[in-house]
């Protein structure tokens, strides 16, 4: 009996050791996989002080599995290049005119490493008034009053997809500041199943383009309809959240008093971004893979798109 108890105890002890090893290995990052890339914004939870985040502070998860982080580089110095498109809705109310000076000042304040383009959403396309340029003064001249014709831009998400698809690949950060009411007049329904919004998000994330948005009302009935402006801002928020950007002004009806606070916050975000590369698990079929970023550094969040598109395993 004593011998049997000793054998049983030894077996149980071995099983516990194997379980512990399995748990430890599950918590360790995988050492191989497909390189995947994200542009990450470091955002303080309280106040405005952003702590320095080092590579060893960053954790990337696919489900419960932790991936290996191979690169975490500040978007500064020789990696600071930024291509920024200002995308404005030509169906906006004339109230947008009072915000153009704020946008001009924001554009003029950009560093020399930033190229700026200006486009207007019209008939489902992005009509480029100014191609990307390092001449910020020249870019500001492309700003104009919106045409303010109801329905001129049936779906702002058609225009965003058009811009993304025509944007040449680049080693620089690529970001969009979208100014619109967000209302999809082409889709019509107010729900979370808008296929044109979904397609625009997919296109932006696959291209590595971050989209931020500021709400401004459109003309006509939709400019003061609580129902329509509610869904328009929900769509803009979803777009920004899914691409790693930020959406501003949940006011539902009426125009923001000023764009300045939102543009100041956007500028703060642009100066605290990092290039992240990690090794993702190769899927059996090419497709989307959800990822989650985490850090043990207090008072900070890591903001990015929540998924990456991966090729099939070879």
Give the ranges of each region predicted by the language model.
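N-terminal secretory signal peptides that target proteins for export/translocation
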Residues: 1-4
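Bacterial N-terminal signal peptides
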Residues: 9-20
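Scaffold/interface architecture of coatomer-like assemblies
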Residues: 26-314
């Amino acid at each position: 009996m004593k011998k049997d108890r000793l054998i049983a105890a030894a077996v149980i002890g071995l099983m516990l050791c194997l379980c512990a090893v399995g748990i430890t290995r599950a918590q360790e990052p995988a050492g191989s996989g497909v390189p995947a890339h994200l542009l990450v914004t470091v955002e303080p939870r309280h106040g405005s002080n952003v702590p320095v985040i080092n590579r060893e502070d960053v954790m990337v998860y696919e489900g419960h599995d932790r991936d290996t982080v191979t690169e975490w580089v500040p978007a500064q110095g020789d990696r600071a290049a930024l291509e920024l498109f200002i995308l404005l809705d030509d169906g906006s109310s004339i109230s947008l005119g009072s915000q153009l000076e704020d946008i001009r000042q924001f554009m003029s304040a950009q560093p020399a490493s930033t190229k700026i383009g200006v486009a207007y959403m019209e008939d489902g396309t992005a009509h480029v008034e100014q191609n990307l340029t390092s001449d910020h003064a020249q870019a500001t001249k492309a700003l104009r009053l919106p045409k303010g014709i109801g329905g001129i831009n049936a779906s702002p998400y058609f225009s965003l997809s058009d811009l993304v698809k025509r944007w040449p690949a680049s080693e620089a950060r690529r970001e969009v500041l979208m100014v619109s009411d967000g209302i999809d007049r082409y889709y019509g329904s107010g729900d979370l199943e808008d296929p044109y919004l979904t397609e625009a998000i997919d296109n932006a994330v696959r291209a590595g383009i971050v989209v931020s948005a500021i709400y401004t009302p459109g003309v006509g009935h939709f400019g003061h309809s609580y129902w329509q402006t509610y869904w328009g801002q929900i769509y803009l928020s979803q777009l920004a959240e899914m691409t790693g950007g930020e959406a501003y002004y949940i006011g539902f009806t009426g125009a923001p008093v000023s764009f300045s606070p939102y543009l100041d916050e956007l500028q703060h975000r642009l100066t605290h971004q990092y290039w992240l590369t990690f090794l993702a698990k190769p899927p059996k079929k090419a497709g989307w893979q959800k990822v989650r970023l985490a850090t043990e550094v207090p008072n900070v969040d890591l903001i990015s798109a929540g998924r990456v598109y991966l090729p099939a395993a070879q």
